[in-house]
């Protein structure tokens, strides 16, 4: 497997709809000239943006967190240009971008250092071959202070790894009917 460059990312997005909407360059400023957390195509990756819909974890109902039987009341919905995550808590969000991963590609997501340096960790599982959808993002606030996440700005970087032509997977995410295939919006745990 080899990591793919900006040229490959642009080609796959523009000719095959791998990323929609797609930004061919790096965006660092908004229309008013204010600095943003960058997003768009980088040398060997794509920096995704957070959509303006969040689910912030709350313990107001004192439910048990169970991935096999997840209670939606564990979250408060927040819509807006920013989201405040309580100390030592987390929030779910989604990418603005919709992904269509080719059969011979595995995509790994890493958090941006701008957030990591503030104690905010982004977690996403790999985007498997032939998976498609909005990526659900998990933001952990590891600090004992409230933390702010910005919608419409960069939050994580996707790295694309392509297998050799003679080593394409036998069974893709789509082939096995993965439970998160085609997800739109912030998607909670499914079993």
From Swiss-Prot:
Q: Name one GO biological process term.
A: nucleobase-containing small molecule interconversion
The broad enzyme category this protein falls into is hydrolase
Tell whether Chaperone is among the UniProt keywords.
no
Keywords for the protein's UniProt record, in alphabetical order: Hydrolase, Nucleotide metabolism, Nucleotide-binding
Please write the reaction equations for the catalytic activity of this protein: dCTP + H2O + H(+) = dUTP + NH4(+)
**Cross-referenced PANTHER family:** DCTP DEAMINASE (PTHR42680:SF3)
- For this entry, the protein name equals dCTP deaminase
């Amino acid at each position: 497997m080899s990591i793919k460059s900006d040229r490959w990312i642009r080609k796959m997005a523009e000719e095959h709809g791998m990323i929609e909407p797609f930004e061919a360059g790096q965006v660092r400023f908004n229309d008013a000239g204010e600095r943003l957390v960058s997003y768009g195509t980088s040398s060997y990756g794509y920096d995704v943006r957070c959509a303006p819909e969040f689910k912030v974890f709350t313990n107001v109902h004192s439910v048990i967190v169970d991935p096999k039987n997840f209670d939606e009341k564990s979250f408060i919905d927040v819509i807006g240009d920013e989201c405040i995550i309580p100390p030592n808590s987390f929030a779910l969000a989604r990418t603005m971008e919709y992904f269509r991963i080719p059969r011979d590609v595995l995509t790994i997501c890493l958090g941006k250092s701008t957030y990591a340096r503030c104690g905010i960790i982004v977690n996403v599982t790999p985007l498997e071959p032939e998976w498609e959808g909005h990526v659900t993002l998990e933001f952990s606030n590891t600090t004992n202070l409230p933390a702010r996440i910005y919608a419409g700005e960069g939050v994580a970087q996707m790295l694309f790894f392509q297998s050799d032509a003679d080593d394409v997977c036998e069974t893709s995410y789509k082939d096995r009917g993965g439970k998160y295939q085609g997800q739109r919006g912030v998607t909670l745990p499914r079993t």
